[in-house]
Amino acid sequence: IETIIGDVHIPSSNTTPESYLVQKYFAQMVEAGCQICVMEVSSQGLMMHRTAGIPFEIGIFTNLAPDHIGPNEHASFEEYAACKGMLFRQCRHGIANVDDEHFDMVLAGHTCDLETIGFSDRADYRASDMELIGRPGYLGVKYHVSGKIDMDVEIDVPGRFSVYNSLVAIAVCEHFKVSQEDLKAALKVVKTKGRIEMIKVSDDFI
């Protein structure tokens, strides 16, 4: 867990730092010339008002499950979902996974504009024709997205969850008018530390 400002990496003990640190880091980002900040806002961070007063441009919901929280983090799963939902009364625009079984619970009472992603016909950004790609030393997934955009996508991180994550990225990039060419190129090479990182042993093993 860390805060990254340009080439500077600042370790953090919390997913969402304390409010005074959030504001301190925002100030440092402005001084460094940052124009956009991406942050993970945890349910506890929202519950403890660490992001209070911040008018987020976009809020994102991908999924929710009981095993996402520890025994001392929330009094109940319902409280957890309600805290997650606070983000969508604090942002101008929401992007949410309509396939998730807790979609309605989390988005209840939202005050933002809302777009949806998923495999469902209800989704504004709909994934279809998902196919696992396997080559010597390589695993990925490809699919087609339709609705508010029409394009084929390939990601070198396999799994259905990767489709959901990339759909969110596509919706966000559409908001900022990123070209399809740049979007496709970025999705093809994006990596997340510790998430299905490939270790090549030989062409026969991964």
Map each language-model feature to its residues:
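Short glycine/proline- and charge-enriched loop/turn segments
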Residues: G6-S12, T62-N63
